């Protein structure tokens, strides 16, 4: 997942005048964060790309002839993913048809700038680009949503809408798989967050390298074992064109604490990130709990275990002027328009009651 954790681009720390521990011929240019090996630039390219290739092969992520959409935001992770996957596709004859797929959330001063980077990547890598927008799909931009609800719950709307937008864009491209730039750091953070929240259901699947196999289009994470620092180093040495600004609506304080904690662990033990992922894989708890059967949303046709999908529930709240209608628990809302009416009535009644006792509240 793309994030600007490193601030302005800085050259990686050099490894002094020692020789590369792999080839023994060229001077070492960096110390690998994952292994602490001091290696030259050329050997770094080789091991970085080979490890990703091995991950793809070991997990059977693709088969010849697959049409694959690369979730492209213009950030470092998705840019490196597009570049490396293009190279590996040619070198190892994966025989994949690759596409860039971007989502325009409608964030002025952020997404419009990053999409310019993606458009340059389209030309640089020779990959067709498809852009889908919140405005076209939902009638709202994130700028509009933030004006309506403020900053507190905006990531909930964006996460739900973005996931569905990627699926809808992928369906338009008729692809077999979506690949995303989620890296080892992202997955380790998610493992830790799910443990802290006690979310066993998400913990059981957050380390899967392929998800959504029961959904419309499976998603793969070729960077599952790739360190964020090494992605930054690769992009720097290769002089790749990427966008490095953080989303203006995404402070993500809770995840930020998890990220800093993992960085502290990594400084003490470089393998800490992989150890956390391994722990998450071994933490899967078998359960006899029956999962809800997947159906389709009565309104938009998207996959859902309820009558209305989460996106339609959230949109219902926005369009009714009750943007918090779909936040948190949605039991009762998902049952259809009648339930939405009841929930809206309850929300209005509760708001009136609270205002009568305590004055105005920002609901």
Curated annotation (Swiss-Prot):
Coiled coil: none annotated. It is found in: Cytoplasm. GO terms for biological process: protein urmylation; tRNA wobble position uridine thiolation. Keywords: Cytoplasm, RNA-binding, Transferase, tRNA processing, tRNA-binding. GO terms for molecular function: nucleotidyltransferase activity; tRNA binding. Signal peptide: none annotated. It comes from Oryza sativa subsp. japonica. GO terms for cellular component: cytosolic tRNA wobble base thiouridylase complex. The keyword tRNA-binding applies. It is an enzyme of class 2 (transferase). The gene is NCS6. Its EC number is 2.7.7.-. Pathway: tRNA modification; 5-methoxycarbonylmethyl-2-thiouridine-tRNA biosynthesis. Belongs to the TtcA family. CTU1/NCS6/ATPBD3 subfamily. Gene3D superfamilies: HUPs. Plays a central role in 2-thiolation of mcm(5)S(2)U at tRNA wobble positions of tRNA(Lys), tRNA(Glu) and tRNA(Gln). Directly binds tRNAs and probably acts by catalyzing adenylation of tRNAs, an intermediate required for 2-thiolation. It is unclear whether it acts as a sulfurtransferase that transfers sulfur from thiocarboxylated URM1 onto the uridine of tRNAs at wobble position. Its main location: cytoplasm. InterPro entries: CTU1-like_ATP-bd, CTU1_C, Ncs6/Tuc1/Ctu1, Rossmann-like_a/b/a_fold, TilS/TtcA_N, tRNA_thiolation_TtcA_Ctu1. This is Cytoplasmic tRNA 2-thiolation protein 1. Residues 337-363 are annotated as: Disordered.
């Amino acid at each position: 997942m793309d994030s600007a954790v490193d601030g302005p681009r800085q050259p990686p720390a050099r490894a002094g005048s020692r020789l590369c521990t792999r080839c023994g011929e060229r001077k070492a240019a960096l110390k690998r964060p994952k292994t602490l090996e001091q290696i030259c630039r050329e050997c770094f390219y080789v091991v970085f790309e080979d490890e990703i290739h091995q991950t793809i092969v070991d997990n059977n992520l693709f088969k010849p002839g697959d049409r694959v959409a690369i979730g492209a935001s213009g950030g470092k992770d998705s840019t490196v993913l597009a570049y490396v996957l293009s190279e590996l596709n040619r070198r190892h004859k994966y025989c994949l048809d690759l596409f860039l797929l971007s989502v325009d959330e409608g964030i002025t001063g952020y997404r419009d700038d990053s999409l310019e980077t993606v458009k340059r990547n389209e030309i640089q890598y020779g990959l067709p680009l498809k852009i889908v927008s919140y405005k076209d799909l939902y009638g709202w931009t994130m700028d509009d949503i933030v004006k309506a609800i403020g900053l507190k719950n905006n990531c909930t709307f964006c996460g739900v809408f973005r996931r569905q937008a990627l699926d809808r864009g992928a369906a338009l491209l008729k692809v077999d798989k979506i690949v995303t730039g989620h890296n080892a750091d992202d997955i380790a953070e998610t493992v830790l967050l799910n443990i802290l929240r006690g979310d066993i259901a998400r913990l059981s699947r957050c380390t899967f390298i392929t998800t959504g196999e029961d959904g419309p289009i499976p998603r793969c994470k070729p960077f599952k074992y790739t360190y964020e620092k090494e992605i930054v180093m690769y992009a720097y040495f290769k002089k790749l064109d990427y966008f490095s600004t953080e989303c203006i609506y995404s402070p993500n304080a809770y995840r930020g604490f998890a990220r800093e904690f993992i960085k502290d662990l990594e400084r003490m033990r470089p393998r800490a990130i992989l150890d956390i992922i391994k722990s998450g894989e071994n933490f899967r708890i078998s359960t006899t709990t029956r999962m809800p059967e997947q159906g389709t949303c009565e309104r938009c046709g998207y996959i859902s275990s309820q009558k209305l999908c989460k996106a339609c529930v959230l949109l219902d709240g926005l369009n009714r002027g009750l943007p918090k209608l779909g936040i948190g628990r949605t039991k009762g809302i998902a049952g259809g328009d009648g339930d939405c009416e009841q929930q809206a009535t309850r929300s209005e009644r509760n708001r009136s009651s609270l205002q009568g006792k305590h004055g105005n509240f920002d609901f």
